[in-house]
């Protein structure tokens, strides 16, 4: 079977294994679309996206328009003569003329089991909500937000200690496997899209920096999910009695009882509204991350003392 003529549209690290899978599956990836270079690092130099760098390494032409709403950009896209466009965390809205241009349409790799967690942050919201399973949905795109009919789905379990980065990586690899299978099925005419169920729709709102603040009046299980969901970004923190903003990079829920925000015996353990949270790795402003024992050596407070401002 002859390979398909494709464009790939993606931007962050999540999308790179998917591009690699397409390039290695015998398809012709004739163009990659990604977001424009952004200032990054201490020098705020313009940096190309991870997908941009990978596409250049693969020798694939790269386009990075700020928008696809203009007639010129849409005409350039249509002129590619695509069988299909594969989209994975691109970050730009695709207008209807773009969605309609490829022969087989635009196919999205979405990091949830639709219709649960439509939207911008499905990985983090699944962990935050305490879901036991996540997954990837390969769907045909339409104008609505992640509302299109589904082609393939694959599950990925969320364990009690799974963090956002580990789930991100597992879903990216799952997406890479599923998109190859989906394209094979589409090319052979043996794959039929199914409408999403009307029940079970939830939305994964975009992450905000202020969501990282830890409120120890909440129960420990909720705070544990918050740390696992929001590390590395937006990151979790609390205001310590020293006046510093202390980052929490890793934690675990444990048994314990006390006034919320006070220290309990057993490492850097903080009482919560219900249970306690042991802070395994923390970071003071401008300092390297340390484990709880190392932090306590510089913060000699006995159990019962308040650590949270």
UniProtKB/Swiss-Prot annotation:
Q: Which gene encodes it?
A: fmt
Matching entries from NCBIfam families are given as: fmt
Pfam families referenced in this protein's UniProt entry, alphabetically: Formyl_trans_C (PF02911), Formyl_trans_N (PF00551)
List the catalytic activities from the record.
L-methionyl-tRNA(fMet) + (6R)-10-formyltetrahydrofolate = N-formyl-L-methionyl-tRNA(fMet) + (6S)-5,6,7,8-tetrahydrofolate + H(+)
**Entry protein name:** Methionyl-tRNA formyltransferase
Q: What does this protein do?
A: Attaches a formyl group to the free amino group of methionyl-tRNA(fMet). The formyl group appears to play a dual role in the initiator identity of N-formylmethionyl-tRNA by promoting its recognition by IF2 and preventing the misappropriation of this tRNA by the elongation apparatus.
- Residues given in the record as (6S)-5,6,7,8-tetrahydrofolate binding sites: 112-115
What family is this protein classified in?
Belongs to the Fmt family.
Q: Which CDD domains match?
A: FMT_core_Met-tRNA-FMT_N, Met_tRNA_FMT_C
Q: Which UniProt keywords apply?
A: Protein biosynthesis, Transferase
The record's section on Gene3D superfamilies has: Formyl transferase, C-terminal domain, Formyl transferase, N-terminal domain
Q: Which organism is it from?
A: Rhodospirillum centenum (strain ATCC 51521 / SW)
Q: Where are the transmembrane segments?
A: none
Q: Which GO terms describe its cellular component?
A: cytosol
The EC designation for this entry is 2.1.2.9
Identify which top EC class this enzyme belongs to.
transferase
Under Gene Ontology molecular function, one entry of this record is: methionyl-tRNA formyltransferase activity
């Amino acid at each position: 079977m002859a390979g398909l003529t494709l464009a790939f549209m993606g931007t962050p690290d999540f999308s790179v294994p998917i591009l690699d899978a397409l390039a290695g599956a015998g398809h012709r990836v004739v163009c990659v679309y990604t977001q424009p270079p952004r200032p990054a690092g201490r020098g705020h130099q313009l940096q190309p996206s991870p997908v941009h760098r990978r596409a250049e390494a693969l020798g694939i032409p790269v386009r990075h328009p700020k928008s696809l709403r203009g007639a010129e950009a849409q005409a350039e896209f249509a002129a590619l003569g695509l069988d299909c466009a594969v989209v994975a965390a691109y970050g730009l809205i695709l207008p209807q003329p773009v969605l309609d241009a490829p022969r087989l349409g635009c196919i999205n790799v979405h990091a949830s089991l639709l219709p649960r967690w439509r939207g911008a942050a499905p990985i983090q919201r699944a962990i935050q909500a305490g879901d036991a399973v996540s997954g990837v949905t390969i769907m045909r795109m339409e104008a609505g937000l992640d509302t299109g009919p589904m082609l393939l789905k694959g599950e990925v379990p969320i364990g009690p200690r799974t963090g956002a980065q580990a789930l991100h990586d597992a879903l990216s690899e799952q997406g890479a496997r599923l998109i190859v299978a989906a394209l094979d099925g589409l090319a052979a005419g043996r794959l039929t899209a199914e409408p999403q169920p009307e029940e079970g729709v939830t939305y994964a709102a975009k992450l905000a920096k202020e969501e990282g603040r830890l409120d120890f009046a909440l129960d420990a299980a909720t705070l544990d999910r918050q740390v696992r969901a929001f590390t590395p970004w937006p990151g979790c923190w609390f205001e310590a009695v020293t006046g510093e903003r202390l980052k929490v990079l890793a934690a675990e829920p444990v048994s314990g009882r006390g006034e919320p925000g006070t220290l309990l015996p057993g490492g850097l353990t903080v009482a919560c509204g219900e249970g306690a949270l042991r802070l395994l790795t923390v970071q003071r402003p401008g300092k390297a991350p340390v484990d709880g024992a190392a932090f306590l050596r510089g913060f000699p407070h006995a159990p019962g003392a308040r650590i949270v401002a």
